Amino acid sequence: MKKLFLKLMKRNLSEDKIRKLGVQVGNDCRFLSVDRSTFGSEPYLIQIGNHVTITSGVKFATHDGGVWIFRKKYPEIDNFHRIFIGNNVFIGINSIILPGVTIGNNVVVGAGSVVTKDVPDNVIIGGNPAKKIKSIEAYETKILENADYTKKLNYNEKKIYLLNKFKENRYN
């Protein structure tokens, strides 16, 4: 099972390939299960800061596809905008970042969020449309209440630790 998991995790586009698409990428970034479609049709309009994690299913839209309904009247119409992601940002699974958005520094974007407007520094956002849920300080306090320190454990040690912590079995 571990080998399958690791194999699936390697299906990512490498940071090098992401840069070759034209995305401007800072240092110490992680791209988890991202592919070419993550960055849309104008990846060169996306700038990502340092220490940013982009998770699977995230989509960046740098254009307004809705202009299609005006194409008969304006055959050449398009509407493009840049997207900026600050430093120390985590973008959760299946989130969508829409054209013209700037996400500040020290931000967590909750899974499934649709980010339609600029996000200030030091907040947790989520929802559709994404809204502030709490400050980064309040989030840190909550996380520390139930934190697990497993980064130095190997796979089996972590498995044993977590199964012991969560012994409840609701189906037997």
From Swiss-Prot:
Disulfide bonds: none annotated. PROSITE patterns: HEXAPEP_TRANSFERASES. Pfam families: Hexapep. Transmembrane segments: none annotated. GO terms for molecular function: transferase activity. SUPFAM superfamilies: Trimeric LpxA-like enzymes. Keywords: Capsule biogenesis/degradation, Exopolysaccharide synthesis, Repeat, Transferase. Gene3D superfamilies: Hexapeptide repeat proteins. Belongs to the transferase hexapeptide repeat family. This is Protein CapG. The gene is capG.
